[in-house]
UniProtKB/Swiss-Prot annotation:
Was identified as a novel immunogenic protein with the potential to reduce the severity of M.bovis infection when used alone as a subunit vaccine. Its EC number is 2.6.1.-. Belongs to the class-III pyridoxal-phosphate-dependent aminotransferase family. One of its GO terms (molecular function) is pyridoxal phosphate binding. The lineage of its organism: Bacteria, Bacillati, Actinomycetota, Actinomycetes, Mycobacteriales. It comes from Mycobacterium tuberculosis (strain ATCC 25618 / H37Rv). This is Probable aminotransferase Rv3329. Probable aminotransferase. The keyword Nucleotide-binding does not apply. Its cofactor is pyridoxal 5'-phosphate. Keywords: Aminotransferase, Pyridoxal phosphate, Transferase. GO terms for biological process: biotin biosynthetic process.
Length: 466
């Protein structure tokens, strides 16, 4: 497979205390702790699968930035696409007007999407796409004579975004508590973490059980009050939790029975992360809506989308009804142009097929870590895996909250110091997440495993008293 073209060489800045101090003084980072003595790394450059900090140190990016940089860093053609579009039409809104890049990208996404999902509403990112999907569901049912259908069901520990609506769908109490009262109408069902499933030994049977909890929740809330079910193909929070065989087939049956919309939240999973352009195709189901972002542009410019079926669009297509919703930068022409160029790379280099061919090798390489006592479970799909850390492999005993916080903080720092950028996830039992750029292959897999092995071996000695 062709490798990426290396960008023109540039000298890295000298270590700068002033730069780090400015970061501390002015920049309010996302999901980060701030305070005396806390310094955050400054990343200045990327090349292929490698990132560089302001001191010249390199790191293998095993998280694709934040599940974003599918095609790797330093893609000159994406920068060139942005520059060309900025020089032609740097901005125009989609508020009753269209632009050529938005038209073309919408057509492209409709071609990739399954079934009759042909209507594309652009946003600036993933959370906005989730907000859009919920609002579409609410208005759709009002327009079709079922105004009471407003609630949404999602899974325990699932993350769907941080704005007030998306946060109501998110299943993480710690993220929700500071911002209560939230938008009402979000309800939770169990997720599909088979490793932590009580009293289940058969994977398919467990999948049926988990899906049936959705039917149970719809019945409990009242079928005439539930508008949609939001599910990720592989659940991010909690550590790359895959769906058991038959799970989504059963969920589709349940949604059809109760006239509830199925939203496939693919903000992470779309665009090759699991394999196909849309992960619902890998798992064999057709949703009513797809939410996506991240890999759509490989992060070279912000963009998200909600893709809806023709059936959902129909009541909005009467010449009178308006979907009174939009974003200033949704479908920005520069971002849309970058998205088109990014998808050109996908097709030219066969990245989806590359992931499908190499995912078994990534899984097998990570599964070598099972010989470490601290590794309890390794799960995921495509180029999206989680490694759950435990006190005891045999009993699956996990760590206390205090232990988990110290453990993951130390593991994250040690991995980064060793030259590996990935993620430690404490939104559930402790997990290390691995999601490398889609151009990665066995050499990168081996480096990831080697560094993980070294750090987790040391961590096991400290926390398991070996």
């Amino acid at each position: 497979m062709p490798r990426i073209r290396k960008p023109p060489s540039r000298s890295l800045p000298e270590p700068s205390a002033a730069l780090a101090n400015t970061t501390t003084r002015n920049l309010w980072l996302h999901f980060a702790r701030h305070g005396a003595g806390i310094q955050h790394p400054v990343i200045v450059r990327g090349d292929g699968v490698t990132i560089f900090d302001d001191r010249g140190k390199s790191y293998l990016d095993a998280l694709s930035g934040l599940f974003v940089v599918q095609v790797g860093y330093g893609r000159a053609e994406l920068a060139e696409a942005a520059a060309r579009q900025a020089g032609t039409l740097g901005y125009f809104p989609l508020w009753g007007y269209a632009t050529p890049p938005a038209i073309e990208l919408a057509e492209r996404l409709a071609r990739y999407a399954p079934g009759d999902l042909n209507r594309v509403f652009f946003t600036s990112g993933g959370t906005e796409a989730v907000e859009t999907a919920w609002k579409v569901a609410k208005q759709y049912f009002k327009l079709t004579g079922k105004p009471g259908k407003q609630k949404v069901i999602s899974r325990s520990i699932a993350y769907h975004g941080t704005t007030q609506g998306a946060l109501a769908i998110t299943g993480l109490p710690l993220f929700k508590a500071p911002f209560e009262p939230l938008t009402p109408g979000g309800f939770r069902v169990p997720n599909t973490n088979f490793y932590r499933a009580p009293l289940h030994t058969d994977l398919k049977e467990f999948g049926r059980w988990a899906a049936d909890r959705i039917a149970e929740a719809i019945e409990f809330e009242g079928p005439d009050t539930v508008a949609a079910v939001f599910l990720e193909p592989v659940q991010n929070a909690g550590g790359c939790i895959p769906a058991p065989p038959g799970y989504f087939e059963r969920v589709r049956e349940i949604c059809d029975r109760y006239d509830v919309l199925l939203v496939s939240d693919e903000v992470i999973c779309a665009f090759g992360r699991i394999g196909s352009m849309f992960a619902c195709e890998d798992l064999g189901y057709v949703p009513d809506m797809i939410t996506c972002a991240k890999g759509l542009t490989s992060g070279y410019s912000p963009l998200g989308a909600m893709i809806a079926s023709d059936r959902l669009f129909e009541p909005f297509n009467d010449g009178e009804t308006m979907f009174a919703h939009g974003y200033t930068f949704g479908g920005h022409p520069v971002s849309a142009a970058v998205g088109l160029a990014n998808l050109d790379i996908f097709e030219r280099e066969g990245l989806s097929d590359h992931v499908k061919r190499n995912s078994p090798a990534l899984r097998a390489t990570l599964e070598k870590l099972y010989d470490l006592p601290i590794v309890g479970d390794i799960r995921g799909e495509g180029y999206f895996f989680g490694i759950e850390l435990v006190k005891d492999q045999a009993t699956k005993q996990t760590f206390t909250d205090d232990e988990r916080a110290r453990l993951l903080g130390q593991v994250s720092a040690a991995l980064f110091e060793a030259g590996l950028y990935c993620r430690t996830d404490d939104r559930g039992d402790p997990v290390v997440q691995v999601a490398p750029p889609l151009i990665s292959g066995q050499p990168e897999f081996d480096t990831i495993e080697t560094i993980l092995r070294s750090v987790l071996t040391d961590t096991g000695r400290k926390y398991l008293h070996l």
